[in-house]
């Protein structure tokens, strides 16, 4: 599998499960991404605290779909502000074996975004953004983000890794307009 295909695999997995075609993405250089997306996405920080700081509130998780197979846990999610407004649509593949059992349990409960769970439980980790992209939202993405008509959306493919370089999760993150 090519690195690019691997970066998007958490996202593409849900389309494959639904036997649907994923929208075409266009890779872009981080510096060419327009603001405020560049400040939010082109960073080595976790999205959860970055978005919480930007929106001045704690975000909560809405799980739209999940697949748990052994040590791999995939979920399609929204991060919502307190008024239930979506601030991120994402797909994530979590490697449960990289986490302690108590943290695994919190992740599987699906109450908090992964970044929040890692920070709140003092799990040392870092982000490694792999790709930045634009996409014209399809029905699935637009419905999830509350977008009424197709428009250009921006996102990133990111890997969360332990301090020892072991992957915790691969994430595809898309922000609303």
What are the residue ranges of the model-derived segments?
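Composition-driven recognition of glycine/serine/threonine/acidic- and proline-rich low-complexity segments
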Residues: 1-177
């Amino acid at each position: 599998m090519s690195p690019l295909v691997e970066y998007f695999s958490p996202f593409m997995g849900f389309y494959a499960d639904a036997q649907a075609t994923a929208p075409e993405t266009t890779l872009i250089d981080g510096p060419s991404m327009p603001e405020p997306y560049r400040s939010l996405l082109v960073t080595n920080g976790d999205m959860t605290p970055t978005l919480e700081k930007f929106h001045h509130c704690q975000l909560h998780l809405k799980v739209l779909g999940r697949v748990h197979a052994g040590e791999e846990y995939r979920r399609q999610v929204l991060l919502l502000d307190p008024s239930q407004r979506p601030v991120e649509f994402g797909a994530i593949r979590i490697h449960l074996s990289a986490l302690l059992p108590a943290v695994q349990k919190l992740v599987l409960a699906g109450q908090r975004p992964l970044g929040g769970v890692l920070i709140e439980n003092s799990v040392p980790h870092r982000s490694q953004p792999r790709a930045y992209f634009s996409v014209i939202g399809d029905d699935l993405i637009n419905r999830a983000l509350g977008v009424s008509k197709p428009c250009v959306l921006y996102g990133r493919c990111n890997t969360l890794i332990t301090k020892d370089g072991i992957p915790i999760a691969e994430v595809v993150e898309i922000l609303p307009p």
